[in-house]
Amino acid sequence: MAHPPLSEFSLIDRFFARRATGPHARAALGIGDDCALLAPEPGKLLAVSTDMLVEGRHFLADVDPRALGHKTLAVNLSDLAAMGAAPRAFTLACALPRADADWLEAFSDGLFALAERHGCELIGGDTTSGPLNLCVTVFGDVACGAALRRNAARDGDDVWVSGTLGDARAGLGVIRGEWRAGEREAAAFRRALEWPQPRVALGVALAGIAHAALDVSDGLAGDLPHILERSNVRADVDVDAVPRSAALATLPADVQRRCMLEGGDDYELCFTAAPSARTAIDAAGARAGVAVTRIGTIRGLSAPTDARAVTWRDASGAPLSLTLHGFDHFHAN
């Protein structure tokens, strides 16, 4: 269907501004001025995060625009979840190679479906022409003293992860021809890659229960060490305890391990908590409808020179000799 040419401001109005406000609108001032205005709620802190998605680096050129709209916001909501913060509002800046009305309609559908599900209001942004590039800044709130931070892991804490790890990386591998999968499994992998589900309800439930947390965006092997470095501790992780999907279990063992430990784009939560919190964490996972799995233990350092690193172990506790790396934007194919 042919559409009349879109100007910058007609594009913003048609696909974004008209859908920006809804029943969850809480901004003092939203789209239409030079700035939006947000009033912090009493007793809460404002949590702010920004993520950029670039074609060819974070998503494929043939991605469904509806899925891309979803993922553009999802990866930012995942950061709020990792802090135990509830979503509140977001801004969107995008460079578009062309003003394609059908593409924009689908993209905004995916974006706003997720925004409405989590009560997150679009309050501003920017558009320009150029190679496809998307940037969201998200705002949330968390009670003072309850935020989950990377520097709060303690000696003796359990290490947990939500959901399963590795399906998104498995999907990328199938698309690239690195390995093969059955038709059903390949579809599940691609869905994990393109439709990540931010664990917002779980993150909010963990605030005040867990000690440290982050979202697994660059692979467990790349992300867990951030907690260890910031908290000045080390960790033992049972590789066999790391949760995997039934689809991932159909792939060769070495591929499973690579995807679970090194793969990115999982957007699950990795967090630590005292052993006394196990019942509360299981209950939080059940309320959020998300499986939670204990995979290891935080250990204190015996000496200041000890490595703040993960010791990967098998089910018997024996250390494994593994060379693992998380995703790095400047050292990735």
List the predicted regions and their residue ranges.
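Extreme N-terminal cap/leader segments of soluble proteins
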Residues: 1-58, 62-64, 83, 88, ...
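Glycine-/charge-enriched secondary-structure boundary and capping motifs
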Residues: 2-23, 64, 97-121, 128-134, ...
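Residue "hotspots" at secondary-structure boundaries inside conserved domains
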Residues: 27-29, 151, 259
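Residue-level signal for inorganic ion chemistry
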Residues: 37, 76, 84, 122, ...
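Glycine-rich anion-binding loops of enzyme active sites
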Residues: 46, 53, 86-176, 297
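Short, well-ordered amphipathic alpha-helical segments that serve as non-catalytic structural scaffolds
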Residues: 68-80, 110-111
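Internal active-site segments that recognize and position negatively charged phosphoryl groups
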Residues: 154, 158-163, 195-220, 224
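A short, charged helix-loop
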Residues: 181-197
